[in-house]
From Swiss-Prot:
Pathway: Porphyrin-containing compound metabolism. This is Siroheme decarboxylase NirDL subunit. PANTHER family: SIROHEME DECARBOXYLASE NIRL SUBUNIT, TRANSCRIPTIONAL REGULATOR, ASNC FAMILY. Transmembrane segments: none annotated. Belongs to the Ahb/Nir family. Signal peptide: none annotated. InterPro entries: AsnC_trans_reg2, HTH-Siroheme_Decarb, NirdL-like_HTH, Tscrpt_reg_AsnC-like, Tscrpt_reg_HTH_AsnC-type_CS, WH-like_DNA-bd_sf, WH_DNA-bd_sf. SMART domains: HTH_ASNC. Its EC number is 4.1.1.111. It comes from the Bacteria.
Amino acid sequence: MTMDDLDLRLLDGFQRDLPLETRPFAAIANRLNTSEAEVIARLARLRDEGLIARIGATCRPNTAGASTLAALRVPVRRIDKVAALVGAEPGVNHSYLREGSDWNLWFVATAPDAEALEESLVRIETATGLVPLSLPLVRAFNIDLGFPLIGPRRAMALDRPTDLDVLRPRDKALMQALTTGLALVPRPFVALGQALGRSEAEVISRIRALAAARILTRVGVIVRHRALGWCENAMVVWRLPEPAVEAAGTALAAVPGVTLCYQRRTVPGLWNWPLFCMIHARSRAEAMEVLVQARALPELQGVPHRILFSTRCFRQRGAVIAEVAA
């Protein structure tokens, strides 16, 4: 799979800030000095080749739905079986085997609400015979995951406050549809509106409102980073006291190469690492270079940490937000 300059500019420039207008692909074409038909054709090809997952949105955790990062301690001989059982749970949208901890199978569980999320974890426990470690999000410092394809690494934008008052009852179905993806047609918001029983204008208006409120953290091209060469994924966890987390997280999120950064709940006796960051890189050496920069931060000098590289990916897809996907 080879990409030319136009492919690279398309993927690099529109992982966020998809033009929210009636003909978004025409607007992209104008910026890239090409045609609407060419943009649509290229996106379709890149999707079919497995380089992009969808044109859609990512949603802030625990706004319209509920989610948690969870882990299991799985004996090596049971990895494949347990991973299959975890992956069979509808709300599991990411699942990785990681080295560097006894907690070796990590997954993100999502559900329409907290009660449904708890029921999902109970089903996983029953199916596997293993008790999940659940680490809900406490605070986000950067969750705007993107992958620069042109030029040097750059720091991700720091997170901004969320306005939950913007949410409306029918937004869940819209957000679920956006995690599935837009149709690659000249007027995709017409097609989306027809599926939801809403007008094109209303769909665009609600997406704009949800994006401005940071409930939708990104609207654009959702790439498959492994297929694009970002094959190393390091989850680095840091142990530091609660009063120090905010300053450390803010500084860590600003390091170029740190792709996600957030605080999660600790569990006494089981997990005492509250600060997490993700480093996606093209090689382990590249990931370790980013970690060297992170460890040099005044806020993190001497702070104990662990590096959990992923060794296998079992599942990666959009979140479950609504009871029935739109």
